[in-house]
Amino acid sequence: MSTEKELDGLLRPSFEIRTIAYCGIMIPFIGLAGPYIGLTTSWILVFIAILILLASYRLKSLIKMKKYQMSLNVIDAFHLNTDQLPWTDKLQWIGRGFAYEDSDAQRVWDAKKENLKPFYRQPAFVERLRKNEVKVSLRKGKHKGLKERAEALLAKQSSKQEFRFGFLPFAIRNIYKPLPPVGGNALYHATGYEREQDVYMPLDDRAGHGIMFGQSRVGKTVFLRSQICQDIARGDGVAGVFDPKMDLELLGIMWAEAKRLGKEDNFYVFLLGEPELSSKYNSISDFSRLTAVAGRISNQMSGSGDGQVFKDFAFNFMVYISAALLDMGEQPTFKSMKANIEDLEGLFNRFGKHLMRKHNPNYIEEYEALNKPKFKQNAKGELVEDKLKMGAMKGRDYSTVITDKITTDFYERNPKLINQYFEGLRSTMKSDQQYTSKLTASLIPLLTKLTSGQLADIISPDFDDIADKRTTFSWDKIIQRRGIFYCGLSAMQDEVTAEAVGNTFFADLVAKAGEINNYGINKGMPGASTKDIIPINLHCDEFQALISSDEVISLLNRSGSAGVRIMAYTQTRADIEAKLGDKAKADVVLGNFNNVFMMRVANKYTAEYLTEMVRTADVMAIDTMGATSDGGAITPKSGFNEDDDANTAGEGFFGTRTQASIKVEAHQPIISDETIMTLPKGQAFAYINRNKLVKLRFPILHDAAGAEVGNAEVIYRELRERIARAT
């Protein structure tokens, strides 16, 4: 028995009951019979004190063992309001739990043994109670006869979580209550339940980014809610969510929290599915390099195979167009880019006129001279109009030929004034129109998706429209104001558009992160320093839907020094690989996450992402051996002395030997794939900074008093009211 206790010994018979019973008998016996057996009062008190201490020690051991055995079946949930979430300026609360050690792996190993399950398995009558509850519920309140009414009363009592009596100031827990519908196996958290405490993660570790894996409906959103609420409350930087599917509940949670903290004026909502409520955002309006505009659009095009040729042409094409627009003082938008691609000839003429008016003082005279009709006699002596030769501009409008003639002649005289972007447009204009159309065939559909209907009003907005009171989203504004944002992309309605818009968000942020890394967030302001950096906390739900381009990879690789902290949420490793189409590329993405959270997952391959990181552990067991032998003697000796050895003398009657030793039953990762795949809902393993393994469980979160989350209609109404107030 003592050896078994040294190996934990929490799954065994209740030996302590005998000790407690013996002490319970001896205490009154000594108290009553002590004087009759010669014990003084002092010795009676000493013996009673010793027995009480012994009984108390054994009772404490018994309570610990029984509590552990009951927790292997179910652990009571814990509840928190959003305003009760604990956090500090340097720590992020990630749940309640404990450091997962070798002893926990040993307890899991033991609890799965069939011969030890009877010590914690619920009694057979509990199953009968559950069957009775089902039978009663099927009657739908119609109980006939005394038996059925008795069954209904029993079902009512057995299904209660706790029992309350009017004369008692406390409730009595129902230890045989129905198990919560969380699935999985409760024993994984029970192994360290007595060590459970609030678990915190240093904010510095968040710069290494984090990823959470978990099946649908196992609690990822609950964890996300607990994290984003802390980021909003802390207010030390940006707090934002990218949500491809647009979860109104999550939007409502963030909106309610912003209102509770008085930060609704700094809350920005971008909703592809609800343009009339959305903030306006032009992802190609803020850039430090001209090529950024073209890159943010062309990167949405496929670059695989022959597609790279079209992508490269589109990039060069849009560099010329964006340069022309900026030179003419026009803001590039998706609308203007599409319009000028479709009317390249018009842009060529406008840009040419703009350049000539700026550099050529004789432009008006030259233009009027070339545009004025001229006549000459043909071979028949007839007067015919003398026009410029079309040359490479064949098929173009005559005004285009004039622009080409004037600019060509001017730049021949003034080669130092040649505009390379205009020359790029000229080269495109001289190309076969059908050839150009083929090269832009994949670009036009993309821009059409981004500029159709009400969608164009929010991603290609008219900033000169003073009647439009919707807020404007920009990374500069959100970072400076330490704002809160929710980006819902409605991918279920239009996945292609959602991907394109999401990628432009990330491309814009990558450029901004590069600027912050070089100049800080206060670039251009008096006293600005490169050390002026604030946290940019991004929570990316359905992460696999946001990584269709290289922008997210760049963000993960290089943005940590700019304050960007990404927490990604996804279901499986295969989702990421399928989206990227390349396992090696997926490994590059996953290699950027220094913090790994693993809830219940659907397959072994995903679970191995964590189990291959953690250390291995030896799980032990007691190896008991016994042997009996006779010494060859027909009759036993009449006596033994201290020199006799019945096992070795050869003349003993018989000999016995019992040996107990500890053996290694298995050498395996401290957590197994099976463990991860059978976690209950709301529980997870976390590997913080790739060196600290903790077992976590998450709360049932409730709205803070006075800041309840409304339904969709309430949220939409309040967002409309906010826009109306701005007018």
Report the location of each language-model feature.
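P-loop NTPase motor domains
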Residues: A190-R195, L203-V218, V222-V564, I676-P680, ...
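Short conserved micro-motifs at the rims of enzyme active sites and ligand-binding pockets
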Residues: K280-Y281, T497-E499, E551, K579, ...
